[in-house]
Amino acid sequence: MAGQKIRVKLKAFDHRLIDQSTYEIVATAKRTGATVSGPIPLPTKKEIYTVLRSPHVNKKSREQFELKTHKRLIDILDTNEDTVEALMKLQLPAGVSVDIKS
C-alpha cells in the first residue's frame, strides 16, 4: 500500500463547500505524512435553462436559470494505511460528491 497514488475528484454546486472539503482532505493527508498535489481547480460547468414566464402567451418574456458545477482535483502521493484510514473516516458536507481512484 505504501507509495500508492490516490486521485480525489470533488464536485459541488456551492464553491464554499467544495473549498472547505478540499482544505479538510489536504490537511488530513498532510497530517498522516502523505505528499499532496493540489487542490487543482477544474473548469466550472455552467448549465443555463431558459423557460417561459407565463404558461400560455408572451413568448418574448422568458426567464433564465443557471446551474454551476464546481470541480476540484487532489492527488495524494506516497500514501500509507494511516492516510487511507483517515480519509475513510473523514466527514464531509452533504452537498459534495467525492470520487476516489487509486
UniProtKB/Swiss-Prot annotation:
Superkingdom: Bacteria
GO cellular component, one term: ribosome
SUPFAM superfamilies cross-referenced by the UniProt entry: Ribosomal protein S10
GO biological process, one term: translation
Alphabetical list of InterPro entries matching this protein: Ribosomal_uS10 (IPR001848), Ribosomal_uS10_CS (IPR018268), Ribosomal_uS10_dom (IPR027486), Ribosomal_uS10_dom_sf (IPR036838)
MF terms (GO), sorted A to Z: structural constituent of ribosome; tRNA binding
Transmembrane regions: none
UniProt keyword terms in alphabetical order: Ribonucleoprotein, Ribosomal protein
Entry's family note: Belongs to the universal ribosomal protein uS10 family.
HAMAP family tied to this protein: Ribosomal_uS10 (MF_00508)
Function: Involved in the binding of tRNA to the ribosomes.
Subunit structure: Part of the 30S ribosomal subunit.
Name of this chain's protein: Small ribosomal subunit protein uS10
Provenance organism: Leptospira borgpetersenii serovar Hardjo-bovis (strain JB197)
